[in-house]
From Swiss-Prot:
Coiled coil: none annotated. It holds the Pfam family Ribosomal_S19. GO terms for molecular function: rRNA binding; structural constituent of ribosome. This is Small ribosomal subunit protein uS19c. NCBIfam families: rpsS_bact. Its main location: plastid. It comes from Cuscuta exaltata. Belongs to the universal ribosomal protein uS19 family. Protein S19 forms a complex with S13 that binds strongly to the 16S ribosomal RNA. InterPro entries: Ribosomal_uS19, Ribosomal_uS19_bac-type, Ribosomal_uS19_CS, Ribosomal_uS19_SF. It comes from the Eukaryota. Gene3D superfamilies: 30s Ribosomal Protein S19, Chain A (3.30.860.10).
């Protein structure tokens, strides 16, 4: 279900403060976050955010077409390794 338009998009407070601080200093550095549910807002464009996948942090460069999406959409939490072989020898 989509978030109500009356409310602002959800962004974790600590993530928002880190991005705001970097924008004031006009610096670019990798921001590490565990907040996969945070919405990408326009002030994040141009930053690299390392999103937690459950095992590691995956650095993602935020571009303007990503605004409005969640951070977790760009960092997959699992790797599909393929289905089991349909080899007769493996069943015996």
């Amino acid at each position: 279900m989509a978030r109500s338009l009356k409310k602002n998009p959800f962004v974790a407070d600590n993530l928002f403060k880190k991005i705001d601080k970097l924008n004031i200093k006009a610096e670019k550095e990798i921001i590490i976050t565990w907040s996969r549910g945070s919405t990408i807002i326009p002030i994040m464009v141009g930053h690299t955010i390392a999103i937690h996948t459950g095992k590691e942090h995956l650095p993602i460069y935020i571009m303007d077409h990503m605004v409005g999406h969640k951070l977790g959409e760009f960092a997959s939490t699992f790797n599909f390794r393929g289905h089991a072989k349909s080899d007769n020898r493996s069943r015996r």
